[in-house]
Amino acid sequence: MSKRALISVSDKEGIVEFAKKIQELGWEIISTGGTKAVLDQEEIPNIAIDEVTGFPEMMDGRVKTLHPLIHGALLGRRDLDSHMKSLAEHHISPIDLVVVNLYPFKETLLAGGSQAEMIEKIDIGGPSMLRSAAKNHAAVTVVCDPMDYEKVEKELSADGETSLELRQQLAAKVFRHTASYDALIAQYLTEEFPVEDTKPEKLTLTYDLKQGMRYGENPQQSADFYESGLPTTYSIAQSHQLHGKELSYNNVRDADAALQIARDFDEPTVVALKHMNPCGIGTAKNIEQAWDYAYEADPVSIFGGIIVLNREVTEETAQKMSKIFLEIIIAPSYSKEALEILSKKKNIRLLTVDFSKKEQSEKEALVTGVLGGLLVQNQDVIVENPKEWTVATKVQPTDRQMEAMKFAWKAVKFVKSNGIIVTNDHQTLGVGPGQTNRVGSVKIALEATADKDALLQENAVLGSDAFFPFADNIDEIAKAGIKAIVQPGGSVRDQEVIEACDKYGIAMVFTGLRHFRH
């Protein structure tokens, strides 16, 4: 008795060659709908599913494989006499190989399918057959990915059957595949049919392996890069690499952080970043000048940094960037000349990202792993209106200082807390990240500012991601000659801080909104 294979695929890639091979090996093929049409066209002998079930496909194909004569043939254990007896009593011939891939739900969603179209792309029979076959992998080979045709074909050709090891691996892959498929459906329907003021009791997320990495944050750590099942266009995951070796774990983390900063600026802007903190941000009327500002902000820390430009890289800008060592440059595009210049540097990584979709990326939730769980939050992308800010001091900020405050407030929310930043209206001057007390961060930012040209420091302001708990911060700021501060306010000692500012003639604005970043 010849062995039987059931083939029902949406993705026809490679199926003709595979079907021809197993037919030559003596397998009987059962097929459905569109798959049968393809096999018939290639004159590959096959049996329609309704010839096996004695029941026609119905409801536009919604019901065709959900039948005991199919699932009994898949689930019957060959090592149990009772199962084999039941198969014989009901005239069911076992099916030994299942080749199924599912309706293109993800592809239809990414193409903007309507709700009605999405519902029709929810596969029922396919996952059922895959799960039945995978459950009975002791006897049944199940294939859900065209990439596995070759290894199955190779074993069948050599031994007449597949090894238990391969069947186990393919079964595990099936359950990963169907779980991912269902997770996308759950995610879509949860967004389409939300329940007001409640959180889903289950969080179903799915990610696809994008890149295996040499190591993680440190060489002793293993790591891989997975991309969301529903890709975000403006992201490092969807970047296109033009030059250089593959990204490392730390590269991906830093590039993601730099892209988030660049997203907040509409004017020509260059972001330089090291170890998840900005070391230079510059904005100008053109990208070359913006590079100059970002570089001058900290010409030491930028060495080996991650650079994001929100305009095309020009020849002039490339010439300047090529003079120092940079890990990564990301931009919407590169001029031909710029690409030629930068590609001469073997160790640099050049990438492009689609900046036209940056607003859409703001909707993606941030997921952070902790031991035993996940934290999920919205991104810190609230649109603030500076007209609603409150001047807390007697001294009013000048127009130039207000422009600098807007710039500082955009930038400081990307500095690790306790985060302090000193800027003028177009350039960061000093960054004080990640200290466990705020005055420590203030001192670092001011020290970095002290070596800047006096002209750069004119109209400089200081931004703080959270309130000042004590007036000692203001003492340090006054010593450095800073005359304007932007911060959220909200401390029980706000009045002490205000009085200190008034004492030193410093203008201070409260935004009413904190921007911690951990």
From Swiss-Prot:
Its EC number is 2.1.2.3, 3.5.4.10. SMART domains: AICARFT_IMPCHas, MGS. It catalyses: (6R)-10-formyltetrahydrofolate + 5-amino-1-(5-phospho-beta-D-ribosyl)imidazole-4-carboxamide = 5-formamido-1-(5-phospho-D-ribosyl)imidazole-4-carboxamide + (6S)-5,6,7,8-tetrahydrofolate; IMP + H2O = 5-formamido-1-(5-phospho-D-ribosyl)imidazole-4-carboxamide. Keywords: Hydrolase, Multifunctional enzyme, Purine biosynthesis, Transferase. One of its GO terms (biological process) is 'de novo' IMP biosynthetic process. One of its GO terms (molecular function) is phosphoribosylaminoimidazolecarboxamide formyltransferase activity. Pathway: Purine metabolism; IMP biosynthesis via de novo pathway; 5-formamido-1-(5-phospho-D-ribosyl)imidazole-4-carboxamide from 5-amino-1-(5-phospho-D-ribosyl)imidazole-4-carboxamide (10-formyl THF route): step 1/1; Purine metabolism; IMP biosynthesis via de novo pathway; IMP from 5-formamido-1-(5-phospho-D-ribosyl)imidazole-4-carboxamide: step 1/1. GO terms for cellular component: cytosol. Residues 1-144 form the MGS-like domain. It comes from the Bacteria. Belongs to the PurH family. The IMP cyclohydrolase activity resides in the N-terminal region. HAMAP family: PurH. This is Bifunctional purine biosynthesis protein PurH. It comes from Lactococcus lactis subsp. cremoris (strain SK11).
